[in-house]
Design a protein with these regions (language model features):
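Short carbohydrate-recognition loop motifs
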Residues: 43-60, 198-218
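Extracellular carbohydrate-recognition regions
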Residues: 1-41, 143-144, 148-191, 310, ...
Length: 486
């Protein structure tokens, strides 16, 4: 469920897409039909670089065993399935694409058309392209079929939010409590109408709904279960059509105590690009159910606007979008954990520099720690966002006690800062943005450093944006540290 903004400015998953398990005639039918076989009595023949399927009068089609082509089998794995399909003599237009218990409906025509879906297999069922109902005994054609495994676990999120150089995005665990984050037809609404999949969304596909507001007292909201006296953030992407910007207002309603938590909150929206709107609030005592309104306006207003990617999450700030396609209890994105161990040859325990260019996700009064260790927090070289507002701290911890603690308070931890922590026996220095900010002339260092981790402290893991992370095996000179952090 973890998304990021890619180099093209699109919101999508950080993933690795493998090669197609279908190759040669199993994919392109250049000289034959490969290993494709009949499903429920259909007739399959090779027809000039394509597969021709002659239907029976009932459910029928073509299929191929993909499970045997995949190391470890296909169950539990996600695939991008793509195929070009079109009518021959059949008048039927409704077909299905199936793999391992998952399927999607498609509508074909006489024009060769590509269909692409992401399907997660739950069993070994063959990849099947078929008509699921009775009909005529005509033909349809299949060509250019691919099935590529998609891997999202253990893939770092390289994020391009804001443009320019990317960063590694490390976020805490969050759950999107909005059950239908992209399908507004499932929301509760007033008199406004919804055009489904009307325009291109922030993920680059045509799956964003457009709302048409015809009169006064219109609204649209989704309900969610909450915990009383808890911080939440409601967010969504919006793009304005013909509606006046001044008419766009959101609200959050306490459905337990029958009162608004926030109401008539105006928000900005462009008519040329998507804007992410965020609203923080705290649930009142006893509140266990809320309504999150993406639009609520009692004034006389007309016009259109589009909404996509709604999210309600517990926390003090909004995190990256977590798609939810109908899970009432919410979809969870696990915390990002980065650890590299067994690198003792790359770290000098006697002296060195830990350098980062980082920005915080929030100045939220928590400790967020990363560092190098010999396998545990008690013996480590640390950099942290401190619980003090906008405070950066560097420390050496030996046997559970701190040998040195260096501090500097920046203007805003949400901005990127270049930070270098020099460590050496009786010689410690913290450099930030081209200046030496704090020093300590007494203290020992840790031996046997061999691990670099964003979760060196199990109770205070690091969350933030990382543009650069470097480890130097010598204590750099002041001139070098100046150049490195400037």
């Amino acid at each position: 469920a973890a998304t990021r903004v890619d180099e093209n400015g699109l919101v999508n998953y950080a993933e690795i897409i493998g090669d197609s398990v279908l190759t040669g005639n199993n994919s392109n039918f250049d000289t034959g039909i490969g290993s494709w076989i009949t499903y429920n009595g259909a007739t399959l023949v090779h027809s000039t670089d394509k597969l021709e399927v002659t239907l029976t009068s009932g459910q029928s089609g073509a299929r191929i065993d993909t499970n045997s082509l995949i190391s470890g089998g296909q169950a539990g794995k996600t695939f991008k399935v793509r195929a070009r399909i079109w009518q021959g003599t059949t008048t039927s237009t409704a077909l299905k694409i199936f793999i391992g218990g998952a399927q999607e409906n498609i509508t074909i025509s006489s024009t060769p058309t590509y269909f692409e879906f992401e399907l997660t297999a739950t069993n070994t069922g063959m990849l099947t392209i078929y008509r699921a109902v009775s009909g005529d005994t005509g033909t349809y054609f299949i060509d250019d079929v691919t099935a590529k495994e998609v891997t999202r676990d253990n893939v770092p999120r390289i994020d391009y939010t804001g443009g320019g150089c990317p960063h590694i995005l490390a976020e805490p665990m969050r759950t999107n409590l909005i059950p239908y984050s992209e399908d507004l037809t499932e929301w509760n609404k007033g008199n406004l109408t919804i055009a489904s999949n009307d325009i291109i969304s922030p993920d680059g596909t045509q799956n964003a709904d457009t709302l048409d507001v015809p009169d006064t007292n219109d609204f649209i909201y989704e309900g969610a279960t909450t915990i009383a006296s808890t911080e939440y953030v409601f967010s969504f992407y919006v793009k304005r059509g013909t509606i006046a910007e001044s008419s766009l207002k959101l609200a959050v309603y306490d459905d337990t105590n029958n009162a608004f938590i926030v109401s008539d909150i105006s928000y900005s929206a462009s008519d040329s690009e998507w804007t992410r709107v965020t609203q923080s609030f705290t649930t009142p005592v006893g509140c266990i159910l809320i309504r999150a309104y993406a639009f609520r306006n009692s004034s006389s207003t007309l016009g259109t606007f589009s909404v996509w990617g709604a999210q309600l999450e517990e926390g003090s700030y909004a995190t990256s979008y977590i798609p939810n396609f109908g899970t009432a209890l919410g979809v969870t994105r696990n915390q990002d954990i980065f650890t590299r161990d067994g690198i003792g040859s790359l770290i000098n325990s006697t002296e060195g520099v830990l350098f980062l260019e980082i920005a915080a996700l929030s100045d939220d009064g928590t400790n967020r720690i990363l560092g190098m260790s010999n396998g545990g927090f008690n013996d480590s070289v640390l950099l942290r966002y401190d619980s003090g507002s906008n405070k950066i701290t560097a420390q050496v911890r030996l046997g559970g006690a701190y040998e040195c603690t260096l501090n500097y308070t920046v203007t805003d931890v949400l901005d990127y800062h270049k930070i270098a922590f020099k460590y050496k026996v009786n010689d410690f220095a913290l450099w930030v943005d081209g200046f030496e900010r704090d020093t300590e002339a007494s203290g020992n260092v840790v031996s046997g450093l061999d691990e670099l981790s964003l979760s060196v402290s199990s109770s205070n893991k690091f969350y933030g944006k990382i543009k650069q992370l470097q480890v130097y095996t010598t204590a750099l000179t002041d001139t070098q540290l100046d150049a490195l952090t400037s």
